[in-house]
Amino acid sequence: MKRALVSVSDKSGLVEFVSGLKELGWEIIATGGTRKLLDDNGIQTIGISDVTGFPEILDGRVKTLHPKVHGGILARRELPEHMRTLEEQGIGTIDLVCVNLYPFRQTIAKEGVTMADAIENIDIGGPSMVRSAAKNWKDVTIVCDPADYGTVLAELKACGRTSDDTRLKLSAKAYTHTAEYDMCIATYMREKAGLNEKLFLEYDLKQPLRYGENPHQNAKFFAALRPEPYSLAFAKQIQGKELSYNNIQDANAALNVVRDFEQPFCVALKHMNPCGAAVADTIEKAWQEAYEADKVSIYGGIVAVNRELIAEVAAGMKPIFLEIVIAPSFTPEALEILSSKKNLRVLQVDMTPSSGDDMQYISVNGGMLAQTLDTSVEVLTPEMCVTKQKPTEEQMKDLDFGWKIVKHVKSNAIAVVKGCRTVGVGAGQTNRVGSAEIALNEARNAGVTEGLVLASDGFLPFDDTVALAAKYGVTAIVQPGGSIRDADAIAKADELGITMIFTGVRHFKH
């Protein structure tokens, strides 16, 4: 008679699974709470103590760590000496192990959990049985996921045993299960002990991608086990083609921009750089201003807003070729309009503010860099002014807006704004003057030549950017400060009647 050992914390689907085994003539060995559930449902089982001849002790900490359990699992059926040993010791074979582990991850996720609670939810016997069964996969079926119950039962009913291929896959899945479990425990204990010299990351495949950044590159999208709501991994795709690698990069950049704004805000991005952005009293006005900021670059880009997307905005977007539209919600009328663009990807994202402690990981050859995300949003005040000319109230609004935008432009980054709208963006140049020239020329080409505000993500190392800005109608500048030549930049600003604010914070983006 075939025997199965059952000991689970996640009891979903268990009664049906074990009932199926019983119908096939299997004998069921069960532990503690698992046995009670099965007995309560009229399924006859054998207690683990009846198999081992030893009682469960230490409040259940020791119950399956016994040769009569592990011998029955690990014995290789094709080796006569193994089978002879089992017979001599009175050990029966165990042909299927159905085990999942104490809910450690769920326990530590609870508010106010104590270390004592966490420790009591570290499984010892469970992982041992899982690993033993997974090691002997040629003879033993290991089932640690209720999602596999149906497959296992179907094969047992059809063939009397599971296939080699199924057992191998279940073995790999089991080792993944125990590895994830131990990694979670190790991470928790290392945090408690103040140890940080190792990094464990755990992600699940969310979707394979057609290709990577370029067609000759392979790519996949992995998601954190518990992604924060304000993320692409948590986003709901309402319509459109599957997201591509570049779509995901751009959409992620868009979310990072949007999260910095509380007023109605709209941003258009291309290659992860804002090309048009605006805040306004309404989301319709913000969209119109962002679109007017750069009607050329928005083509083939993505647009994100931080308010419900309404029909009027959707109607404005309809004639434009866009890859993605992102919003916290959409009116039915807006979705109806956007639905006419079948390939347009429409993403709904919960825009609840982030906790601010998210980590960013960048792969490098032979290693990985880790840093906290740059979620810092500085509050600019007139007291930050370092020049004789003090900012007006309107300039302060533009300085604040420009500072938030330039943070999300690739360095060296310059943003030129007016009326809380971008009028020029200079990104990714190897010198700051080059980025300034690009942004300022965009503003001039748009016919905006007076009352401009310039924002720089890094300090101005010389006074040349200040002098250049003045020629294009810039009257106020915001920058981190911190150069050994700050005095030169301040003197030039004073000479030209320009207001300058030092934030004391740099926002490089590579």
Language-model segments: which ranges?
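Mobile "lid/hinge" segments at catalytic clefts and subdomain interfaces of large enzymes
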Residues: 136-149
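Active-site/ligand-binding-proximal alpha/beta "capping" segment
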Residues: 77-124, 131-134, 384, 388-393
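N-terminal glycine-/serine-/threonine-rich phosphate-binding loop
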Residues: 1-51
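Glycine-rich nucleotide/cofactor/substrate-binding loop typically near the N-terminus or early
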Residues: 33-103
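Hydrophobic beta-strand scaffold residues
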Residues: 28, 45, 140-142, 346, ...
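Short gly/pro/ser/thr-enriched loop/turn and capping motifs at secondary-structure boundaries
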Residues: 34-37, 52-58, 104-106, 128-131, ...
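Non-catalytic interaction/clamp surfaces of large macromolecular machines
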Residues: 146-147, 151-199, 320
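ATP-dependent carboxylate/acyl-activation modules
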Residues: 1-6, 96, 181-510
